[in-house]
Each structure stands twice: as C-alpha cells, then as structure tokens.
Amino acid sequence: LAAGLRFSPGSDKRHLRRAWQGAVVSVIVLVSCAYPGAQPAGDREHRITLFTQYLESLRIQAGIPGLSAAITANGSIIWEGGLGFADVEARVAAAPHTPYRIASITKTATSTLLMQCVEAGRLNLDAPIRTYTTTVPDPNATVRQVLAMASDAAAGSTYRYDGDRFQALTPVVAACSGVSYRVAVARQILDRIGMADSVPGQDLEAPTEAASAEFDPATLTRYRAVLARIAKPYVVRDGGPTLSEYPPKGINASAGLVSTVRDLARYDAAIDAHVLMSSSTQLVAWTPFRLASGRESPYALGWFVQSTAAGRAVWHYGQWPTFSSLMLKLPDRGVTLILLANSDGLSSRFPLAAGDVAVSPFAHAFIQAVR
C-alpha cells in the first residue's frame, strides 16, 4: 500500500480517488489471494489477522491521527488495537480503552431505547410523532418514519439521511421512558450492560445544575475521569493533523455519546444476546423501511441494513468534523468491526449516507476478509 500518501483539501479529487482505489485494491487482492472464496470458520483468525495488518496503511491513507479498533466474534473480542495517537501533541497512543465521540452511532442507542418502549407497551411506532412531542419538523410524520429517516417531503415516500430531523426523537424517548434522554441511555444501556467507560454527553465534564441532579456524585466523578482521557479532536490539512475544537458537547437522539471500542463491543454482545430487547423486536428494528413506492429503504429503524459479499450487514457510521466512527455487524458471519477515530477520516470522503457500507475502504476490506 502507498503508506506515505497524505490527503489535503487542496488535492485533486481524482488523484485522491485513485489513491484510495489503489489502497483498497491492494488490500482486497492480498486478502482474496490468501483466502479465495468463502472460507471455513476455522480460517477466520488468519483472515482477521491479515485484515488487521493493513489497518495502519488504511489509517494513514484516510488521514486519521488516532484509530481504535475492535473485532468481535460471537460475542467476544477476538482482536483489538490502537493505531496512531489519541493526543498527537502529548504523544498519547490510541488504545482500545480510549474514549471518543461516537457521533451518529448514538442513533442506534436511540433505536434501542425506543424499541424497549415498544416492548413495554409505552410507544406506538405508527402513531404521529406529535402524540409524544410538539417540537417536530412535520407533526404528521409517524415515529417510525422519523426513526427510518423517511419523514422528509411526503412522509414515508423517500429516504433522506437527516440527523437534524432525527433529533426530534429526543423528547419521544423522554416521553416514553419517563426520564431525560441522557438518563435513559445511562440506565437502560450503559449501566445495564457495564459500559463503564461510556458517558451520555461530553458536557458532563462540567455539568449544569440540572444535569448534576440526574446522577449521583460517584457517577459524575466516574464520568469526569473518563472524559479526562477522551481523544483530542483533529482536522487534517496539508497532510497533517491540526488540533481543533470538540463538537457540541451535549447529547440528543442523533449524536453525543462518548464511548470506547471495548464498550461498544459490550454493546454489540448485548445486542446479539438479546439482553436489551427480544429477538423479535430486534428483527423489527433491523427490517428495512418500505417506502410508499414499495421499494425498500437502505435504512431500517436507526440502523442501515444491506446485503454484502459476506451476507447481511447491519451497520452505522458517525461523522463530525473532528471525529468519525463505524460499527459494522455481519450477522451471517457472526463478526463485528468497530472503528473510532479522532478525525473525520472514517466517513467524510465516502457517501455512506446513501446506504452502501462497501464504499468505505475499511468496511470493504473487512467484508472481503470474512466473506
């Protein structure tokens, strides 16, 4: 791989595209030649090892200062690592326990909370969203349509990825759970499955009086200790990282959760073990939304769902100007890839919102490795 290449905003886009294509093709050719075609499960460790050997080259190509990664199989971490730096200036290495802003992977937590409300009989997905809140862009849209990114224009007619509209689900979670969104995340997900290095909002490093009242002092102390280790935010300019600003530090249904790849591996295991909801409810969440035309959307209920060379993929990405993330589940193979970065390099150059995870070189190489 062309490990020495760097990207900069002023570079020719076609040159960047060719560089990425060369990097991805190199990975795929090497993986495919070593393990042609579908392979028995016993070869998985070798295929995963081959994939991980190329993560550093992909990180450099993407302009990511620090990358943390974990791969799970059947509920357990089989590989984890950190590449580059969580703090470039202080030379603090990225690690599996490094906290990051996970951006829109937060949306999958929103899906989980709402589906828990459905199971408890406290939420009707097909009720107008105005039933639960008045702060909505389209009061005639249903909760399901907003959760499925299909509330734009004529509700239910088109898919359009829109994080701002998704935020309308924040008060819906509060209405059906009886507590604020951040408390619901903490109680129903983080505390429930032991995600001790995750925090429901970076603003809890200096909480308001209202936020302080929602958590006991010991919990707030733990949150502050986690946030003291959070990766620094960077933008990549002229081939190098420049320290920048953190995204807005609050949390809502669309973004704001802080976590680590280890904690997200716990989340992944809990999903697969149906700790957070029943298998039948999870199936509903992972069923692509059917648009008014009858066509399936690439988005289900808070998750992307599609077919790949490795079978079905259930996934989500996240993107801020200074952070990015990817959680890619391949249920037919029983494996999951989790990536967190302190720049936008995992997401910004790839049209992931269109619903094809394979446009990501990281995802494409992983799919080829485990297919």
Each model region followed by its residue ranges:
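Active-site helix/loop module of the DD-peptidase/beta-lactamase fold
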Residues: 50, 66, 96, 101-105, ...
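Catalytic nucleophile serine of serine hydrolases
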Residues: 104-106, 160-163
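Bacterial N-terminal signal peptides
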Residues: 22-32
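Bacterial N-terminal signal peptides that target proteins for export
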Residues: 8-23
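Carbohydrate-binding/catalytic loop surfaces
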Residues: 205-247, 251-253, 299, 304-306
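Catalytic loop of the DD-peptidase/beta-lactamase superfamily, centered on the K-T-G motif
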Residues: 33-81, 179, 186-187, 191, ...
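Active-site SXXK
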Residues: 55-58, 69, 75, 98-126, ...
